């Protein structure tokens, strides 16, 4: 947008031009209002909030606008202190986030979207372990898919998605409608519990000849 204060290597354009920013905020609210009235999304995923304060974005006003049409709308945390769930990026948190709900955002290689020169793809095994790590702490995994300019998905990404499909289909009981597992001091690995909390699932990354479980 021409009134957005884009950052360059040396300066921030329109930093001291409040009228331009006010015009952008009006435009932003207009776009959100149109989306809300026309399409009524169940979820809004914001990004780039760090470039302005909550007051500058009018984050509270945005939340009120979105919920005026759909009181149950879900909003991610990237709106300067507002929203329902946290979105750490590119690395599993060392400990479970304080937020009740959270979702790790991760790329299959090193880039968001499609970058033809980026061939540094993570293996399906590595990404599945990341997924399980998230599940064990009560989180979700948002895995980036970057289609090419013609709309097709790169073969490397298709291979990852197919592996995820095979694995999740086989182990769906230990994935869907589960919650965070037991503390790591009780089991040195990834775990989840079923909704009732009376079934414990252990994720074993390698085939073992013997598993000893003590009471």
Regions flagged by a language model, labelled:
Residues 1-210, 214-215:
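Mature catalytic domains of secreted/periplasmic carbohydrate-active enzymes
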